[in-house]
Amino acid sequence: MSEYVKFTCERTNAEFTAFDGFAELNAYRRQLRELRLMGVDSNGVGFGNLSVQDGATKNFYITGSATAGIPELTLADCAKVLAYDFERNWVGYEGSTIPSSESLTHAAIYESDAKAGAIIHCHDSRSWAVILNQAPTTSKTVKYGTPKMAYEIMRLFRVTDLHSRKILAMAGHEGGIVTFGRDLEEAFAVLMHERKESSPCANSAFHKRTPA
């Protein structure tokens, strides 16, 4: 298992059938990589992940751990999350790759907002610095990829305008931003709007990115 994955996991099947939205996921992922909002840092650590939810089953498909450096994903580079348990710090999945280290974070968003259908986690230090404590922001003491992060995000849904803002900053992980929407188009649009508001012409800088 990847050293960055902090949950225990259980695989039920090594393969799953192609899902609607896989081509779209790859397309938006390609744009994020071109903007250097996901990829691999100078230490060789991948950062950034995406997911889409199956509205019928509430399962969700997420990019696999340690796949951020792959230019174009195949189905084998994704995982289908079937179940999770925050208290046990556990994820049940299908697929040949381990789900992203942020799988519990994605699960918390889908559980908290019935309208959420897609999530983007990326790293953009410039936008992060602007929205930190201005948009919904997780506690600086909470680490990424943990049950505490899942619970913290669920708290933000209860006490902030996260439902309407659809974006949050991770105070304890410099550069970490999460956006969501009814689909990837909306999640990406939220992210691009914040980048434009932060600095229309600036290139992002990156620090201490969250492993995929």
Residue positions per predicted region:
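Glycine-rich flexible loops
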Residues: 1-212
